[in-house]
From Swiss-Prot:
Protein name stated in the entry: Putative multidrug resistance protein MdtD
Gene that specifies this protein: mdtD
Periplasmic compartment spans: 1-11, 70-76, 125-137, 186-196, 246-262, 307-341, 417-430
Family to which the UniProt record says this protein belongs: Belongs to the major facilitator superfamily. TCR/Tet family.
Membrane topology of this protein: Multi-pass membrane protein
Coiled-coil intervals, chain numbering: none
GO cellular component: plasma membrane
A GO term for molecular function: transmembrane transporter activity
Amino acid sequence: MTDLPDSTRWQLWIVAFGFFMQSLDTTIVNTALPSMAQSLGESPLHMHMVIVSYVLTVAVMLPASGWLADKVGVRNIFFTAIVLFTLGSLFCALSGTLNELLLARALQGVGGAMMVPVGRLTVMKIVPREQYMAAMTFVTLPGQVGPLLGPALGGLLVEYASWHWIFLINIPVGIIGAIATLMLMPNYTMQTRRFDLSGFLLLAVGMAVLTLALDGSKGTGLSPLAIAGLVAVGVVALVLYLLHARNNNRALFSLKLFRTRTFSLGLAGSFAGRIGSGMLPFMTPVFLQIGLGFSPFHAGLMMIPMVLGSMGMKRIVVQVVNRFGYRRVLVATTLGLSLVTLLFMTTALLGWYYVLPFVLFLQGMVNSTRFSSMNTLTLKDLPDNLASSGNSLLSMIMQLSMSIGVTIAGLLLGLFGSQHVSVDSGTTQTVFMYTWLSMAFIIALPAFIFARVPNDTHQNVAISRRKRSAQ
């Protein structure tokens, strides 16, 4: 990339900055949840909605982000994304109630949903094709550093300042990024087809109301009749989308995608697998603080080995898949992650705290291998003309399943804790033990899906997408 013009390198730095902001925010909040609960006068069991409101909004808005960038221009949308994200951060810091915080997090989610896909699109437009891989590696590296710094930085700010500062630090950074975007980034546009607004609204309603219904009466305060109504609305919306997309070449996501067996299996496995994995970043710092009495900063530091394990495995995951095949790798890592989850709970409750960093490092390695394998399995056999649509659907499902995972984790805590969980409670560790056992069971379930994956171990098939025409 040394031969790129200075203006292009500055534009890549702006995109990298956006990736860093978005990835940092996905992890920095987790460590602060118990302190937020105390400050807002809420039960810690309700605080999972702080994560769900953000991730679910990202899932809902992702399908529209690429079309908006093509229609309005990448600079305009990237600038808007940073402004919305920064305003959301300000409103989060000013929130005095949980409901205000949830609305502010949703606004952050709108910005976050546009930031990363539009950033990828920007790189595609400003960098020559032969340098695209190097440019993407450069801009995504800060996105890998964000999760590494997030938990510890969040814990540090909570312990020595207040939870408000995990949002306030975004404001000066966001202002600088917005100004730099206006000054340095070109406003590329492309001719677009008509946006499938009907399909978008049906999917958005279906995802949102079903996730809200899943939270149940304990989280939302809704009556059983109201929850049943939400479920009915969500199911009807998704069924209507399927009818809308059938034989519709302009549908948001073509049903032709599901003619590819590996895509169908990979998407189902990714959805189920990330529900279980999505529980862990939320539950681990909450358990360390409320269940074991760790300080926020100490709990944040304990999350670093998990991120390091994840980053370390990315270098060899292709060799592992080529050696053993997708089916063996996915079944083994799914069951392995379930066992590591049980190991973490056991060592923590036995008081073997010095072992926890090694267990979390192992958890990161296993999780990273499974994530990478799920992603490539899902997309590897799609024909070229469906690859972009399939990737967008996978990205949406990834965010949706993580929001559902956090919702289920909060639901389990509420079920076993009867709304009474605190550091001083004598039953707290028992509540967490039952919750972790349930999580381990849920994490293991996708192994049944992955057992149906063709056991293809040939390198040219395992890491390359076949070019076929979609008939």
